[in-house]
Amino acid sequence: MSGVNDIRSAFLDFFKKNGHEVVASGPLVPRNDPTLMFTNAGMVQFKNVFTGMETRPYNRATTAQKCVRAGGKHNDLDNVGYTARHHTFFEMLGNFSFGDYFKDVAIELAWNLVTKEFGLDPKRLLVTVYHTDDEAAGHWRKIAGLPEERIIRIPTSDNFWAMGDTGPCGPCSEIFFDHGEGIPGGPPGSPDEDGDRFIEIWNLVFMQYEQVSPDERINLPRPSIDTGMGLERVAAVLQGVHDNYEIDLFKALIHATEEAVGVRAEGERRPSYKVIADHLRASSFLIADGVLPSNEGRGYVLRRIMRRAMRHAQLLGAEEPLMWRLVPALVREMGQAYPELVRGEALITETLKLEETRFRKTLARGLNLLSDATGGMGEGDRLDGETAFKLYDTYGFPLDLTQDALRQRGVTVDLEGFNAAMERQKAEARASWAGSGEAATEAVWFSVKDRTGATDFLGYETEEAEGIIAALVKDGAMVETAAEGEEVAVVTNQTPFYGESGGQVGDTGTIEGEGFAIEIKNTQKKGEGLFVHFGQVKKGTVRISEPVSLRVDHERRTRIRANHSATHLLHEALREVLGTHVAQKGSLVAPDRLRFDFSHPKPIAEEELQQIEDLANEVVLQNAPVVTRLMAVDDAIAEGAMALFGEKYGDEVRVVSMGKGTQGEKSGKTYSLELCGGTHVNATGDIGLVHIIGEGAVAAGVRRVEALTGAAARRYLDEQERRLKAAASVLKVSPGDLLPRLETLVEERRKLERELSEARKKLALGGGAGAKAGEEREEVGGVGFIGRVVEGISPKDLKPLADEGKKSLGSGVVVFVGTSEEGKASVVVGVTDDLTGRFSAVDLVRKASAAIGGQGGGGRPDMAQAGGPDAANAAAAVEAVRAALAG
């Protein structure tokens, strides 16, 4: 029972037998909790239950919760690899009581599990309690039979837990395992407590108080229990090892890395293997939960983790991207417990491969810069902040990666200098933006909401309604009236107008009253439930408290509805064709088009796009009813409804279902089932037709499809057909023969371009037929020299030309200046290897570049290239090189 998977199962089974509901792990990105970057403890998904804001159909629960501690307040990233127990990703086993049992039962359950189920020797266990918690100490004596010397009272906050400055709180009791006298370290509370002998394996939190103010704490009416046991730690204890990275799970991941790299995980290399194994888990689980590498927020933390592992892969000698090759080993070890790894394996693999391929392009150059900057440094020295910032800004090195690279040499980074450089860049960015006053403008809506309350939205049932003008806003301030011709924002007590949200654009239409009319150009949601109509007064004077008639533009709303329903069909079709890793990352639902952004690591093949379009249109042709139901959010998710990752949902949600599947697992089942607050067609046939018009990348790991529906799709296809026939007519072939004819013409053009390029090269190397470059040779300053201006040659052809020139010279310098019809010039300088000690092609090309108005140039000592806007001075560029040689 000592394998990680066995331990996890034994823990959950034990508490299930003791009346606990086994609850699946929450996602790593907490739902509806902006205070946390990542889930970092088992109680996170129960936070609202503990505070009384949410109820569950059970009052006892147990979980194996995936957690990440990297970035923000809880950050173990810097220590991973160099200690026995630090992780960025770990599993927290826990049991919870929501007002059911309390200290005595919690202690009895914990003691029975560790001593009877896990079989740990009671003589090697000791516990801590908060120094005033006599009740807990008494239970440990009575239930576990522990003597007083093995019940250690701790007066610090280590043994008192609080959710925040206010809210539930209470004392803790921790269970420690004694590894024995051969391991250095003292018991908890002693000066040597940070040693490895006594290891905490379980923390029991007794939530019995509520902190109502800094000076006031009251008893909770229903005390609760929250416990947390680190799976990796207890596995190390049960497997008889002192390092978490020696348990079976990490052994498998490290072995897979050894096989991929071909080097044993020994000595100084061992920390790199630990880093890779840990960061592989963190990266893979974050990607599976919808986080993708980016330059901000959670995505940047993921990128930092990935790039730190990638540097350690490079230290081990990996010459190709490594991380993606280890994913199958991780899925084998953890996929059964966490099926999201299996579902997301393709996305995880491609994302890791793409990120490492990109980073490797700058990794070597960044490490060279770091080496040059710290070449003479040793213990106690500091790298200047400007260089650290350059590594971050230019080469993509997160600060902690630079710190990690310098760690073993004892070199630190000037953090003040780094932060100053970062702030300077931000200040420059802010200065380049004049500002729009949006913050001040947005503040008015809080005042409006206080005055009017939320708007009653009627738009699911009707497109016309009567209402009362509750507020008018002009130029960021509330007003009593608005005159003809003025732009105004209108808030009514109720409205059929949909406010822009969830990717769907806001409605347009009219608001009319006695003697006035307003053309509504957009509708937006402001804050919680305030619908704001933006428009222009077309007639009369508008006043608050006036009764009005509100009419949505029916034809426009109809097209929006069709496009919104089509996005649902495309979403499901994308998942069916590409895989279940596809998750919505954004959308636009407009009257004239739709676009859908989703997680996928690579371009979609044409045949896959056709499959996706065909699947969506199959459901359109079913003319199936589109059904909307109001459901409890948990019931909707349990039924299989797709939710937008990270979106905040209330207790009750709208669930939109449409169509029947015809293939695979979907056959005979509801085709599309999503949580959605938008407006939709009554039946799928109302969509008419779905046609994909584009696919491309939005960001790393995020793709976008664009599509048209109904009449817009038909007009688009009609126009495409018209153009096809016109093109066929120009080439005097039938539309069916157009493609082979075009392929023939393209190949003929390529052949002519190659022949023209060769002719220009020959001309550049010496003129007419039979001429040789050697015939153009000069002696300048005792050095062989060829210099020519070549009209109409592309910059990419100059380098091969210079190679030919160098070859024909044997020893010497060549310069070729190409000119274009646009009046621009390109120059290349080549220096044979025997002369690079005397002449640098880079120095020479910069002299030539100056003559044609260029700003320098670059390359190697034997070959360099530059450009400039002044082709009229091409000959002067040649002369500049000639003069430099003549010296």
From Swiss-Prot:
First-level EC class = ligase
Any one GO CC term of the record: cytosol
Q: What is its EC number?
A: 6.1.1.7
Give binding positions for Zn(2+).
564, 568, 676, 680
Is Protein biosynthesis among this UniProt entry's keywords?
Answer: yes
Listed under GO biological process in this entry are: alanyl-tRNA aminoacylation; negative regulation of DNA-templated transcription
> What PROSITE patterns does the entry give?
AA_TRNA_LIGASE_II_ALA
Q: How is the cofactor bound?
A: Binds 1 zinc ion per subunit.
What InterPro entries is this protein classified in? aa-tRNA-synth_II/BPL/LPL, Ala-tRNA-lgiase_IIc, Ala-tRNA-ligase_IIc_anticod-bd, Ala-tRNA-synth_IIc_core, Ala-tRNA-synth_IIc_N, Ala-tRNA_ligase, Ala_tRNA_ligase_euk/bac, DHHA1_dom
Q: Which residues cross the membrane?
A: none
> Which catalytic reaction applies to this protein?
tRNA(Ala) + L-alanine + ATP = L-alanyl-tRNA(Ala) + AMP + diphosphate
Where is it localised? Cytoplasm
**Comment, domains:** Consists of three domains; the N-terminal catalytic domain, the editing domain and the C-terminal C-Ala domain. The editing domain removes incorrectly charged amino acids, while the C-Ala domain, along with tRNA(Ala), serves as a bridge to cooperatively bring together the editing and aminoacylation centers thus stimulating deacylation of misacylated tRNAs.
Give the protein's function.
Catalyzes the attachment of alanine to tRNA(Ala) in a two-step reaction: alanine is first activated by ATP to form Ala-AMP and then transferred to the acceptor end of tRNA(Ala). Also edits incorrectly charged Ser-tRNA(Ala) and Gly-tRNA(Ala) via its editing domain.
| Protein's name according to its UniProt entry | Alanine--tRNA ligase
Q: What species is given as this protein's source?
A: Chelativorans sp. (strain BNC1)
